[in-house]
A protein has these predicted regions:
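GHKL/Bergerat-fold ATPase module in large chromosome/replication-associated machines
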Residues: 112, 130-153, 173-177, 183-684
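GHKL (Bergerat-fold) ATPase N-terminal catalytic module, capturing the glycine-rich phosphate-binding loop
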Residues: 1-180, 187, 194, 585, ...
Length: 684
């Protein structure tokens, strides 16, 4: 028996390994099985090169549990190790067998990852003791057993083993007993090893017999050694890709289409990326791309390897050229990664472009599922926008699709305002905003449907990209003020009458939670509705953006602001105005007379003060101005009360307000019930 210390630069490296080297303890199993697979592949390479003349035999890697003994064993029939190799590759932690091996077989080493390196020591994250029982493939080699309890001290002794290969026996630590459970190991093997290039067996298959599961003699192989991405695309059919997608994502809807990646210069990259059906909720779609290194699962956190918007895709990327840290769990940013990201982005945009050109109708049919992905890409990657602007689509409220250039050409003549700005009208809900859409269409305008999660941010982006272009929701104002065709015409209603109308309706507006409503009076034509509610495009857009972007919570806290616009040309509004003036004239006469008198007095007082220096104005004069201002305000409040008392009993005023609120989904609860009862009374 030989004893010694592992060649490490610190006396206690194992606590470091256990706590800090690997982010997830569970990946020890990936490292162990990966090492076994590597050793098996090396054995196969030696046989192919003629450096091993014996029987290759079954190269299956086997994982087994012994709950009674508290051990987990990973066995292979690979190249094994001699005592000298154990001393070099295991005891001297700074060396790795992969360097010697790759140097010898560098011209034929595409599928070789390595043998024992730091990955082996991940076993101590879950083990109180590790045994290696190994026998080299070399003629005359003896079996050797290496044991270590997690300290730098180790023991090497002779062992009994008939065939070449290695058994790694992990004596599972007391605080890691979950790794002695069959379901846990099965789950980890499915996660990390399901596409490894050498068969991996865990127990035996079972069959249902006599009312229970019974083990058969057939190995339970957990992996597919030739996953779809390793095959030549020309040999595959659509059903092959769909079937593989179902293997990866059993509960997902069928993908729209896919891209088979296959490049060997200037970097190695294979894989299949699927376009899923993305309706909403971007965050739920992320982390569906699985990253592999020579068919060994590394991570599904691929933000560092592909642009952010591509994380919405599903599928597999496999590359030995993506740099990993010692734990193989976190990506490092370097030139190769950037090249790979650029390549993938180009392949994705090329695929979308080709589908658009070859099958425009099919592309349009898929647009609702593709839209959020393409919009996200244009918002987050300038290079993707430059490509996508030629195939990204706009959809109008009639269900017709247009490219950016096509739609601009369509609306250019009719929707350019007097200042030369091209106005893109849009709706976020064509049912709720139906009347606004119809009003716009009556003037010959086209209205886009922008009801997706990222449509409004995309509109903001396009305003920056497209010269003199503005996107405005169709209910943000009356249509005459959204697309102003000529200078404002002379008002058809005198200022005092507009004020009377405004006050009548303002006094009867309901108090809404976190919302303010202002009344406006406009000449809109007899055929237009008597009253509509609009909301500022700017404030609504800022509030929408605040839900998607951090740092904009200020807008989210602000109350909603609406305009109740009265159409002074409509017969109902004229009727309210005429009725109001005839019913309030007597009460208003003395009030308005008093207001005029007080306003004239205030003007005289201010004119007198304007001739003096500030220090020459007496306190009495200041108080006189203040008292006169208060007197005017008191009279205006009386005037307001007169209008309020009139409006309170006017069912038409209340009905018009409620109709406008109802049209915008703002009439609810008791107010809605009151409206219904009033409507019935008016019908009688």
């Amino acid at each position: 028996m030989q004893k010694g210390n592992i060649g490490v630069t610190t006396e206690n490296i194992f606590p470091v390994i256990k706590k800090f080297l690997y982010s997830d303890h569970e990946i020890f199993l990936r490292e162990m099985v990966s090492n076994a697979v590597d050793a098996s592949q090396k054995m196969k390479t030696l046989a192919e090169k003629g450096d091993f003349k014996g029987e290759l035999g079954d190269l299956t890697v086997r994982v087994s549990l012994d709950e009674k003994e508290g051990t987990l064993t990973i066995s292979d029939r690979g190249i094994g190790m001699t005592e000298e190799e154990i001393d070099k590759y295991i005891n001297q932690i700074a060396f790795s067998g992969v360097n010697d091996f790759l140097e010898k077989y560098k011209d034929n080493a595409n599928n070789i990852i390595g043998h024992f390196g730091l990955g082996f020591y991940s076993s101590f994250m879950v083990s109180k003791k590790v045994d290696i029982i190994t026998k080299s493939y070399k003629d005359g080699a003896k079996a050797v057993k290496w044991s270590c309890d997690g300290s730098p001290a180790y023991e090497i002794d002779d062992a009994e083993r008939e065939s070449r290969g290695t058994d790694i026996v992990l004596h599972i630590d007391d605080d890691c007993k979950e790794f002695l459970e069959k379901s846990t190991i099965q789950g980890l093997l499915n996660k990390y090893c399901k596409f490894m290039p050498v068969p991996v067996a865990f127990g035996k298959k079972t069959e249902w017999k006599d009312g229970k599961d019974v083990e058969t003699d057939e190995d339970n192989i957990i992996n597919n050694v030739e996953p779809l991405w390793t095959k030549t695309p020309s040999t595959l059919k659509d059903e092959d890709y769909k079937s593989f997608y179902r293997t990866l994502y059993p509960m997902q809807d069928e993908p729209l289409f896919w891209i088979h990646l296959n490049v060997d210069y200037p970097f190695n990259l294979t894989g299949i990326l699927y376009f899923p059906r993305i309706k909403s909720n971007i965050e739920l779609q992320r982390n569906k791309i699985q990253l592999y290194c020579n068919q060994v699962f590394v991570t599904d956190q691929v933000e560092g390897i592909v642009p952010d918007f591509l994380t919405l895709l599903h599928g597999v990327i496999d590359s030995p050229d993506i740099p990993l840290n010692v734990s193989r769990s976190y990506l490092q940013s370097d030139r190769d990664v950037k090249k790979i990201a650029t390549y993938i982005t180009k392949k994705v945009s090329d695929r979308l472009q080709s589908i658009f050109k070859e099958d425009r109708k099919g592309f349009e049919e898929k647009w609702d599922d593709l839209k959020i992905f393409i919009n996200y890409g244009m918002l987050s990657e300038e290079s993707f926008y430059d490509r996508a602007k030629d195939f990204a689509l706009m959809k109008d409220t009639e269900g017709k699709y247009f490219t950016f250039d096509e739609y601009r050409t369509l609306i250019k003549d009719n929707q350019t305002d007097k200042d030369g700005n091209l106005i893109y009208l849009y709706s976020t809900n064509k049912e709720e905003q139906y009347s606004y859409i119809e009003t716009a269409k009556a003037k010959g305008y086209s209205v886009l449907l922008m009801d997706g999660e990222l449509d409004v941010p995309t509109a903001s982006m396009l305003e920056q990209k497209l010269e003199k272009s503005h996107f405005t929701r169709v209910d943000s104002d009356i249509i005459e003020r959204i697309i102003v065709k000529e200078d404002a015409k002379k008002e058809s209603l005198e200022a005092d009458k507009k004020e009377h109308l405004s006050t009548v309706f303002t006094t009867q507006l309901p108090k809404l939670d976190k919302a303010e409503i202002y009344v406006d009076v406009e000449s809109m034509g007899e055929q237009a509705q008597p009253v509509v509610i609009t909301q500022s495009e700017y404030m609504r857009r800022m509030k929408d953006m605040s839900r998607l972007q951090a740092g904009m919570s200020f807008y989210a806290q602000m109350p909603d602001s609406y305009n109740l616009v009265l159409n002074s040309d409509h017969p109902l509004i004229k009727k309210v105005l005429d009725d109001c003036e005839s019913n309030t004239a007597e009460a208003l006469k003395p009030i308005e007379s008093e207001i005029k008198g007080q306003e004239a007095r205030l003007a005289a007082l201010r004119q007198a003060q304007d001739k003096k220096k500030p220090e020459e104005i007496t306190q009495e004069e200041k108080d006189d101005v203040k008292n006169t201002e208060k007197a005017i305000e008191d009279e205006k409040n009386k005037k307001r009360d007169v209008f309020a008392n009139y409006a309170k009993g006017n069912s038409i005023v209340h009905q018009l307000i409620d109709l406008a609120l109802l049209q915008n989904g703002m009439l609810k609860g008791a107010a809605l019930d009151k409206f219904l009862k009033r409507s019935i009374e008016l019908i009688k």
